[in-house]
């Protein structure tokens, strides 16, 4: 498997390498969002990514807002730049859903919340079902939205709209045969 910190570092190296006259020391901070910060994607993954992709002089941090973690990292970076506390921040998210089990390695639910609001601990699939009921979204509506989204993405890729944003990453493949 490719570790999420290695994956993010490869993307960041490509990003900064594609900017003319850019030096890593120009980066004031690295902010990485991650939904399940455990094991290979836990600890201080933001710092590790900075060490792998930028330099020891660039700090790095990890934030968590579950599925919105990467977007929140970008919001935080924009707010800091807008406030004048930074000029250049690399921000985004990284995750490896195959490296960490759902709910993490040790689920530690809050007893009071689990008794008073058990729905707070619904997984994303069940949350989607609840939201579909609440907002009257049918399966057909959801499928149509998904199809349209994929068609737009394919069209944009074919037209080259994301040629500078999509980075090819070569990974080592591992096959396990249980014969």
Annotate each language-model stretch with its function.
Residues 1-10, 21, 141-179:
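N-terminal extracellular/periplasmic Venus flytrap/periplasmic-binding protein-like
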Residues 65-94, 132-162:
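Active-site-proximal alpha-helical scaffold in enzymes
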Residues 2, 6, 34-87, 119-126:
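Conserved catalytic cysteine-centered active-site region
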Residues 11-28, 48-62, 76-89, 155-165:
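Structural signature of cysteine-dependent C-C bond-forming condensing enzymes
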Residues 34-35, 53, 92-94, 100, ...:
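Fold-independent oxyanion-binding glycine-rich loops
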Residues 38, 96-98, 153:
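Glycine-rich nucleotide phosphate-binding loop and flanking beta-alpha elements
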Residues 5-20, 45-49, 73, 124-131, ...:
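Short, well-ordered amphipathic alpha-helical segments that serve as non-catalytic structural scaffolds
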Residues 82-135:
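Flexible glycine-/small-residue-enriched beta->alpha junction loops
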């Amino acid at each position: 498997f490719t570790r999420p910190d290695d994956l993010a570092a490869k993307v960041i190296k490509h990003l900064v390498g594609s900017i003319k006259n850019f030096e890593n020391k120009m980066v004031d901070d690295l902010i990485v969002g991650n939904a399940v910060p455990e094991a290979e994607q836990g600890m201080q993954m933001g710092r590790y990514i900075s060490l792998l992709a930028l330099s020891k002089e660039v700090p790095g941090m990890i934030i968590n807002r579950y599925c919105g973690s990467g977007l929140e990292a970008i919001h935080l970076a924009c707010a800091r730049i807008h406030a004048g506390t930074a000029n250049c921040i690399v921000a985004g998210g990284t995750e490896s859903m195959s490296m960490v089990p759902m709910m993490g390695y040790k689920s530690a639910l809050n007893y009071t919340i689990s008794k008073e609001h058990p729905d707070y601990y619904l997984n994303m699939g069940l949350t989607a079902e609840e939201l579909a009921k609440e907002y009257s979204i049918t399966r057909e509506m959801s499928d149509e939205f998904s199809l349209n989204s994929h068609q737009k993405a394919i069209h944009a890729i074919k037209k080259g709209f994301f040629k500078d944003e999509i980075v090819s990453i070569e990974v080592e493949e591992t096959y396990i045969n249980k014969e």
